[in-house]
Design a protein with these regions (language model features):
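Conserved ABC ATPase "signature" region
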Residues: 122-137
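Catalytic Walker B motif of ABC-type/P-loop ATPase nucleotide-binding domains
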Residues: 166-169
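H-loop/switch region of ABC-family ATPase nucleotide-binding domains
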Residues: 201-202
Length: 250
């Protein structure tokens, strides 16, 4: 798959205005009843790179992404996207889930639906589908795509908005190895073009390949956050060490 987006000048569709990064999260709490599933999360993300969010099951990774994206509201705490208004921030983000969310239409129509709201054209749609290796399936119903193809289409829909920040919630969890590498290549190309990536994964090998920095969550808190180059060889928290060594983290 070629990086057609980088080569096609028609694809500069990012929303105008001041950047929404850096991001500052302070004392973020999310409660369900009496249970704090996120408990005092404080986090800073700069304007570039790929942040991988890791941690054991139930540590709050997916919930944190949904809060940052604005799909959920915290019980308390602040999420500051460089002082931008929530509506402006939402327009500059995209979120891809583990299970692709697609229209029951053709592959091309799935892209057109997004582009119509953004003033895009057929040249942009063609470039997006070529970029994710689906140009030859433009007229096919999306429901007939394989799991890997469907996730690539979901990524193309996300990239159609030219997001400043791309959130990915375990997008390769149920895919075969070839599809995993294809998704990683698409995400890597987006990162290289300047899109800020926040990527949840349980796959340690994938995290090593993708991460510039790692946020490790444990019991709803940030147990560790630092450069990937230091985290993987020498994690500072006991929970992260156990996790990386394949031990059960409680």
């Amino acid at each position: 798959m070629r990086d057609t987006l980088a080569m096609t000048s028609a694809l500069t569709g990012r929303a105008p205005g001041s950047p929404i990064l850096p991001l500052a999260v302070r004392d973020l709490v999310l409660r369900f009843g009496d249970t704090a599933v996120l408990d005092g999360v404080t986090l800073d993300l700069g304007p570039a790179g790929c942040t991988v969010v890791m941690g054991p099951n139930g540590s709050g990774k997916s919930l944190l992404l949904k809060l940052l994206h604005g799909l959920m509201r915290p019980t308390s705490g602040t999420i500051d996207w460089a002082g931008r208004a929530p509506a402006e921030v939402t327009a500059r983000q995209a979120l891809v889930f583990q299970k692709p969310v697609l229209l029951r239409r053709s592959v091309a129509a799935n892209i057109d639906f997004v582009l119509k709201a953004r003033g895009g054209d057929r040249a942009r749609r063609a470039a997006l589908l070529d970029h994710v290796g689906l140009a030859h399936k433009a007229g096919q119903p999306a429901r007939l795509l394989s799991g890997g193809e469907a996730q690539r289409l979901a990524l193309a829909r996300a990239l159609a908005t030219d997001p400043e920040v791309l959130f990915l919630d375990e997008p390769t969890a149920s895919l075969d190895p070839a599809s995993v590498l294809a998704i990683e290549a698409i995400v890597g190309a987006a990162r290289a073009r300047g899109t800020r990536i926040v990527f949840v994964t349980h796959d340690i090998g994938q995290a090593r390949r993708m991460a510039d920095d790692v946020v490790f969550l444990h019991r709803g808190r940030v147990a560790e956050h630092g450069p990937a180059a230091g985290f993987f060889p020498e994690p500072q928290s006991a929970a992260a060490r156990d996790y990386l060594n394949g031990r059960i983290v409680v």
